[in-house]
Amino acid sequence: MKLKNTLGVVIGSLVAASAMNAFAQGQNSVEIEAFGKRYFTDSVRNMKNADLYGGSIGYFLTDDVELALSYGEYHDVRGTYETGNKKVHGNLTSLDAIYHFGTPGVGLRPYVSAGLAHQNITNINSDSQGRQQMTMANIGAGLKYYFTENFFAKASLDGQYGLEKRDNGHQGEWMAGLGVGFNFGGSKAAPAPEPVADVCSDSDNDGVCDNVDKCPDTPANVTVDANGCPAVAEVVRVQLDVKFDFDKSKVKENSYADIKNLADFMKQYPSTSTTVEGHTDSVGTDAYNQKLSERRANAVRDVLVNEYGVEGGRVNAVGYGESRPVADNATAEGRAINRRVEAEVEAEAK
């Protein structure tokens, strides 16, 4: 009956622990365990090896040090006498200090323990009478494995040494056991404090601290670089140079890719605009070449606007005739270079 009551208390405690919200390990936590052990008696005692079932409750003084009180009852214990076997009753109460290795949390935590125990045995004599009590020193070691922050399984090995000398000397016994349990109620580790941003002086309010500001008097609303100086915008540009056959204003197929590149750039920088400039070589009259250069400029503009979707208001077309050569018109090679349309677009990179 005592064993049933003990196990009932332990099981009830485990259920209650599982319903709690404030589960934690470490300092101030409580640990409750149910165990079963195989008890190996000293050879000088008139008792056979037996089983010990019970439970324990422990309190963590620190993250690693636990003080645990346990109670167990011997099960199926028999004495050996000349008159035959006698069923023996008994219990064992222990108080142990336990030191855990490792860090609280999920995983394996080895431990060592030491403490005192009180053993109470009845029906010890061959006439089914008598009581034997003994105070014993405990020493042990084992492993706990935490499946979660709170639930664990344990394997243990404990030795006991009788402090009171009997007729047959001091008695030494040992136990090997398994257990399961919960721990709860500890205080969670305090979260690390939020880093405090360094406070610096910024006299010109440009966002750069005075101790690294190389331009400490920057006017308000001026964009600055990492040194606190007015940012210099990076200028990016695209140039276009489309060549034409003699006396022609039709854009050749091999020039479309270059025109598309210019159109893509203008779409990337929608505030830009451009002037498409048409040119000719020196063959023909000035008036004819002027008209030809304008047709060439308008042909390229049409491709930009109609083929590649650049807004018409952003593209201007102008012809310069033969007035702006870039090569010698006295040679065929030079005249081929001069039959051209040019355009350029600049933008400030953000």
From Swiss-Prot:
It holds the Pfam family OprF. This is Outer membrane porin F. It comes from Pseudomonas aeruginosa (strain ATCC 15692 / DSM 22644 / CIP 104116 / JCM 14847 / LMG 12228 / 1C / PRS 101 / PAO1). It is a multi-pass membrane protein. The N-terminal beta-barrel domain (residues 25-184) when reconstituted into lipid vesicles is blocked at both ends. Residues 190-195 are annotated as: 3 X 2 AA tandem repeats of X-P. InterPro entries: Bact_OuterMem_StrucFunc, OMP/PagP_b-brl, OMP_bac, OmpA-like, OMPA-like_CS, OmpA-like_sf, OprF_membrane_N, TSP_type-3_rpt. Might contain two disulfide bonds. PANTHER family: LIPOPROTEIN YIAD-RELATED, STATOR ELEMENT OF FLAGELLAR MOTOR COMPLEX. Residues 1-24 form the signal peptide. Sequence repeats lie at residues 190-191, 192-193, 194-195. It is found in: Cell outer membrane. Has porin activity, forming small water-filled channels. Also has a structural role in determining cell shape and ability to grow in low-osmolarity medium. One of its GO terms (cellular component) is outer membrane. Residues 231-349 form the OmpA-like domain. It comes from the Bacteria. CDD domains: OmpA_C-like. One of its GO terms (molecular function) is complement component C3b binding. Keywords: Cell outer membrane, Cell shape, Disulfide bond, Ion transport, Membrane, Porin, Repeat, Signal, Transmembrane, Transmembrane beta strand, Transport. GO terms for biological process: adhesion of symbiont to host; monoatomic ion transport; regulation of cell shape.
